[in-house]
Amino acid sequence: METRSGGSGSASGGGGGGRMRLRKTESAEMRWVVSGGAYEEDEIESSDGGGGTPAAASGSRGGCSDSDDNYEEAEMLRQRLVRTGPRADSLDVEAQDVAGMNRHQEITVGRSIVLAVQTLGVVFGDVGTSPLYAFDVMFNKYPITSKEDVLGALSLVIYTLILIPLLKYTLIALWGNDDGEGGTFALYSLICRNARVSLLPNQLRSDTRISSFQLQVPSVELERSLKIKERLETSSMLKKLLLMLVLFGTSMVIADGVVTPAMSVMSAVNGLKVGISSVNEGEVVMITVAVLIVLFTLQRFGSSKVALAVGPALFIWFCCLAGIGIYNMKTYGSAVLQAFNPMYIYYYFERNPTQAWMSLGGCLLCATGSEAMFADLCYFSVKSVQLTFVFLVLPCLLLGYLGQAAFLMENLTENQQVFFLSIPNQAFWPVVFIAILAAIIASRTMTTAIFSTIKQATALGCFPRLKIIHTSRSFMGQIYIPMMNWFLLVSCLAFVTMFGSINEIGNAYGIAELGVMMMTTVLVTIIMLLIWQINIIVVLCFLTLSLGLELIFFSSVLGSVADGSWVLLVFAAVLYLIMYIWNYGTKLKYETEVKQKLSMDLLMELGCNLGTVRVPGIGLLYNELARGVPGIFGQFLATMPAIHSMIIFVCIKWVPVPVVPQNERFLFRRVCPKSYHMFRCIARYGYKDIRKEDYISFQQLLIESLEKFMRREAQERSLESDQYDGTDSEEEVASASSRALVGPNGSINSLGVPPAEAAGTTEHPTIGSSMSFDGSLDEAIDGRGSLDDELSFIHKAKESGVVYLLGHGDIRARKESFFVKKLVINYFYAFLRRNCRRGIAALSIPPSRMMQVAMQYMV
C-alpha cells in the first residue's frame, strides 16, 4: 500500500487513471478525485509504505498474506464514496464548520497588552539577566590591559547579540514553530509531519487529514524538497541520526535548565558582596540555595498566575539596564560607541589572540536565553515576540553593556562584579533587589521551557511518561511536571554546592547553550530545505554563518571541560541514554506487538461469538497498535469465560501536531463483519492537547463518535445503493459514480448531474439534504432498519456497563541476544517502564471497571 505524509510533501496520484490534486488552505483540504484514484480513503495503512500506487495496492489484495488487511481493504474499496470540497472532518461528514485552532482567534487590544506584559515575564527573563555575569566571565582568566581590550570585548558582545538572538532566533528560528510551539522537539515534530522519519511505525494516513495539517500543490519548486523527503524516509540511518541529534539537543536543554537557575541567582546574590563587604562566598552559596528552594516551590502556580506579576518587574529591570547604561556613558564618556565598528574584534584578536579566544566562552553568555526564548514561545505570537525583542529587549541590553564597558574603560582593574560596581550609589539597593527578582524570573523561564520540551518528547515517544498538571484554564501550553521540577531542584542545588562560583558555572553554562544552539541550527536548516523551500544559497549562508560561529564558540568552551564542565556533560549523557533507551524499548515493543497480532482468518474461524460466550456490555481494550487486532486480545479470550457483546480496540495515539480538534479526536473502523460488533478506535491527541476528561466523559465522547461513524457509514451505503441501482444505463452509472460532493453541511450531491438550482430544471433531482431516491425503496428501508438496530444494540450494551480491558505487555530480550541488549531491555528499560506513569492513569478508572491480563513478548 502507498503511504503519504502531510505537510508540504508530495501528492501521489496513481492507479486507474485517477489523479489527485491538492492545494494549500488554512485548515482544510480541497480534493478533486476521479473514482479510479479514490483509494486514499483507506485509513489504516501499511507501516512500511510498500507498493507505490493505488493500483498496485488494489492488485495485491488478492494475494496479501495478512487477511486482516485484506478484509479492511475490501471494506474500504466497497465504500466507493468519493469526496470533493472542503474536508471538514476526517470522520464525520455532518460537520458544519472546519475545526479551527484556538490561536487563530482574533485578539483584542486589551488582550494584546496583557500578552505583551506576560511575554516579558515568560520569554525574555533568561536573556535579560545576562549582563549580570557576561563581562565577569569574559575577563575572569586574563586581566584587562588596555581600553582597546574593552572595546574589542564589547564589539564581540554587540555582534553576538545581533547574530544569535536577533538574526538566528528572532528573525529566523521563531518562524520554525509548530503552530505556536517552539523548541527542539517542535522542530522535530514539524519534520515528522512533513516526512515519515519517526522510528515508531504507527502513522496513519488519516493523521494527515487532521485540520492542523496543511498541504501544498506539487510543482517544480518542490522537486528539491521531495528529493530530501524521499531520502529521509528511505534511509534508516538518517532517521536514527536525526533522532540522536534531537535527543542530544533535548538533553542539553535539560542540562541548561539546571545551570541557568544556579548561574542567574548566584550572580544576582553576588551583588550583596559589593554592598556588604562582610558577606563571603559561603554565605552567597547558602542564600542562593534558599532562593532556589523558594523558586522551585513556587513553580507549581504556573506561568499565567505569575507572569502578570513578574512581567512589570522585568519591564522595570530592562529600564534599569538602559538607565544605568545611559548614566555610565554620560559619566565616563561615550567612546564605547566605537565598538559598533567590527574592526575592533580584529584588533582584539591581533593583540591578544589567546586572551580573546578564551573570552569567547564568556561572550557567548550574553546570548544565553535565546533557546529558552524559542522554546517558551507557547501561546505568544511570533510577531509579538519579535517586536518586543527588537524594540525593547535588544536596545536595553545594548545600553546595559555599553554602560558597563564605559565603566571598565575608566576602571580597568575592576573586572569582577562589573554590573554592581557600575550602579550609581543612590540606586544600588533597589537595583540589587530587582536583579535578584529578575534572576528568579529568568530561572522560571528556563524551567518552563523544560516542562514544554518534556511534554513534547513524551508525546513523541522519546521520554518516560510523567504526571503533567495544567496550570491554566485559558492556555493549554502552560504546564507543571512535579517530578521534573524536584529533579531540577536537586540537580541545581548539587551544581551550586559543587562549583560555588559563577565563573566555574559559567563555563558549564556555555557548553549547555552551545549544544542546544547547534542542534537548532541543523533542524532549522532541514526545515528550510524540506518545508520552507528557500533558495539553496540562502540556506547555505544561514548554515555556514550560524554553525561556523557556534563551532568557534564551542572551541573556546571546550578548554574549560577539565575545570569542571565535564560534570555537565556526564549529566547530559545520562539524560540522553534515558531518552534513547525509552525510545528504543518502545519501538521494539510496538514492532513485536505488530508481529504477534491476531489474524483475521482466526477470528473468522471462531465465528461472531469468538469461540466463547458474548455477554451484554461494552469492552474497551486498550492497546498501542494503530492497526490490526492485538495479540493480548487472544489472552482475554483464553482466560475469560465470556467476552462482551461489543468490543472496541482503543489506541491512544499522539500525532505530530500541536492540537487535534475535539470533533476529529476519534477515528473508527470495523474490524470484522457487522455481526461481530467489533471496532477499532484511535483516539488522537496532539502534543499540546490536554487529556483532562475523566473516564465517564471519555467513554461518552467515544460512544457518540461511534454512533456518528455508523450514521456516516449508513449514509455512504445509501448513496451507493442509489448510484448503482437507480440508474438506467452503464453510462449513467459511470457519470453518477465518478464524482460526488460532500458539502460542508454534510449534504451529498452528485457531480455527474448538476443541482436543480444551477441547471434551471428539475429533470435530474439533486441528492441533498432533502434527497429523493430513485433506487429501491426496500433497500433504503432495510439500510435504515439496520442502522436503527445497531444504534439500539449500542445503547443496550452501554446500559449493561462499560469495562476497561487492560493488557500489560512486557518485553524481555531473548536468551541468544547480545549482553548489551539484555542489559538495556531487561534492566534499564524495564526499570523505566515500572516507574513511569501509566497512560491509563490519566482517565482515573475505578478498579471495579478494570480487567487486566499480562503478556510477555520476547524480542
Swiss-Prot record:
Family the UniProt entry places it in: Belongs to the HAK/KUP transporter (TC 2.A.72.3) family.
Composition bias, Gly residues: 1-19
Major place of residence: membrane
InterPro entries in alphabetical order: K+_transporter, K_trans_C, K_trans_N
Annotated function: High-affinity potassium transporter.
Name of protein: Probable potassium transporter 14
Organism: Oryza sativa subsp. japonica
PANTHER family documented for this protein: OSMOTIC STRESS POTASSIUM TRANSPORTER (PTHR30540), POTASSIUM TRANSPORTER 7 (PTHR30540:SF8)
Organism classification: Eukaryota, Viridiplantae, Streptophyta, Embryophyta, Tracheophyta
Subcellular location: Membrane
Carbohydrate attachment residues: N411
The keyword NAD appears for this protein: no
Entry GO terms, CC: membrane
